[in-house]
Amino acid sequence: MFACKNCGGNVKFDIKSGQLACEYCHSLFDPYAYEDKTSDAEVQKDFDATIFTCPQCGGEILSTDDTAAGFCSFCGASTVLYSRMQKEHKPAYIIPFAKTKDDCKQAYMSLMKKAIFAPKELKDPKFIDGFRGIYMPYWTYYVTQKAPISLPAKRSHRSGDYIITDHYRLEGDLDAYYKGLSYDASSSFDDNISEKLAPYDVKNMKRFTPAFLSGFYADTADLPSTIYASDAMDAACTNTVSEISKEPAFTGLSVDSDSAALSPLSLGTTVKETDYSMFPVWFLSYRNKDRVAYATVNGQTGKVVADLPISVGKFLLGSLIAAIPVYILLCLLTVLTPGMTLTIVGVLAIIANICYSQELTMIAVKEAGTEDKGRIAKEQPEALGAINNRRRLKAAKKATKTIKKKTNTSFIAYFILFIFVIQFVPALFAIIAGIGGSFGNADGSLILFVILTIISFIFSIRAFSSFDRMPGHKGVAGLIFGMVSMLIGDAVLLFQPVLDAWYYGAAFIIIASVLITLINVIRAFNVLTTRKLPQFATHKGGDDRA
C-alpha cells in the first residue's frame, strides 16, 4: 500500500491523470516517485505483493494493497479470498489503464443493446458495476526477419472454356523488424479472449513500477516465454507475406500456403528479445450454476469481448414473432395440404438436427481446450507439437489469401440475403413439399419423407456421439423424441388414413420435437458461450475495487 507524501492517506493510480491520487487531500504524484531507492547498482528483479487465493477454485491474484478481496473474477464466487505476502517477479513494462470504469461500462452497454436475446441479468446496472480492473501478464516478442526470399505465387484467369494459371517467383531481400508481438502469459486467460482483445499499442508501454498496480489487481505469468515464441514468428511471417501481397505489382497474386518458403526458417525469422509485460483488462464474470461467462474490455482501447449466453424464453418468443410473416407468405404461395404440411415440418426437423449436431461438435472442440495453447501447455504439454503445426497452417492460409480491394458492400449483401429469405425460402419449402405430388401418388410423399427421416437419423446419431461433452448429458430424451416423431410421420404416410387429423397430429408431434431440439440448440449454444468453473492447483483469479 502506498501512502500520500502530504497527509499519509492511501493513494491509488488515477486513470484520467495518469498519476497516483490521494483519496483524502487529492494530491497527485508521479508513480516513479515511489520506487525503492537502493544503493545497489543492480536493478531489483522482484517486488513485494499480497497474493489472494480463492478458496473455491484455487485462483490466485496479486496486489500491492493488503485489503481483503471479496470476489473471485474467474469463478464468480462471492467469498473472502485468503491472502499471503510474497515476492513476485517484476515485469519489464506495463501499459497503464487508459479507459476508466465508466468508459468500460459504456462500451459494454453499447454491445448489450445489440444482444436482444441476452439474459436480463447481464444488463442489470448492479451486475455491470462489478467490472474489475486487472493487469494481465503478456510476453512481448521482438522479431527480426533478414534473408533472401523466393516465394511461389500464381494468378488464374479464364480464357474461353479454359482456366489458365500463371506461375511466378516473388524474389528479393527481406529485412523486417516487428516490435511488441504479444501473447498472454497466463494459462488461466483463455487464448480466444486475449486474441480478440488485441491489439495493444506497445508504443505506450512504460517501464514497470509497482505503484501502477495501486488500486488494481494483477495476474502473474505461469507460462514460459518459449510457449508462444513460434506463434510470434508465425505472426511475423503472416504479416510479411500480407505486406508483400499488397505491393501494386503483386495485386491479385496468391502464394502457395503449403510452400516451405513461408516457414519462419525460410524467411530468416528470429526472436531477438522477449519482455515480460502487463496489459490492462476490465474483467467481469457471470456465473450460472456450474458454468461461467466472461466479459472483458481492453483497458487501453475500449474494445469489448464478451461471452453472451441466450435466454431461452426471449429466443423462443423472437422466433415465434419471426415465424408469423414466413407462415403467411407460405400460405400465399401455395395451398397447404395435410401431406405438404407434414413434409414441411420434416424439413424443419432436419434443419434443427443439423444445427444441434454442429453445436455439439463445436462443444467437443471447446471443452477439450485444443484451441487454448496456454491451457494445453499446462495440462497436456506433449500435445503442443500438434497444436503448433495446426496454428502454423492456419496462419499460412490466412497470409496467402488473395488481396482484394475493400468495398462497402456488407450492407448490400445483408439486404440481398434478407430479400432472399423473405421471398424464396417459403417458396423453397413449398417446392419441397410438392415433390411428393409430382410422383403422381401418395407413395411419392412417403418416399420423400423416408429420405428426410434417414437424413434426420444420420445427424441424430452424430449428435449422440457428442453427448458426453454436454453438461449433465442434457438433450438425449429430446433427440430420441425427435427420431420417434419422424417415424410417426412415416407411419401416417404409409397407412394413408382418411382423416386429415392423423396428418396434422403427426405434424404437431414433429413440431413439438423441433421446438425441443431448438431449446437444446440454445442450451448447446450457451455451453459454447460459457466455460466450466475453473479449478486450479495454482491459478490466477481476480478482484478489483477501482
Label each PLM-derived region with a short phrase.
Residues 89-287, 313, 335-346, 354-414, ...:
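Charged, low-complexity helical/coil segments in non-catalytic cytosolic or luminal regions
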Residues 4-7, 22-25, 54-57, 72-75:
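Short cysteine-rich clusters marking metal-coordination/redox-active sites
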Residues 1, 17-19, 47-51, 69:
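Residues immediately within or flanking Cys/His clusters that coordinate Zn2+
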Residues 16-21, 34-39, 65-71, 84-90:
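Short cysteine/histidine-rich zinc-coordinating motifs and their immediately flanking basic loops
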Residues 10-12, 30, 62, 80:
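Short functional micro-motifs and their immediate structural scaffolds
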Residues 26-33, 75-83:
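Short Cys/His-rich micro-motifs in 6-15 aa windows
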Residues 279-313:
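Extended, hydrophilic extramembrane loops/domains of integral membrane proteins
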Residues 397-546:
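Alpha-helical transmembrane segments of integral membrane proteins
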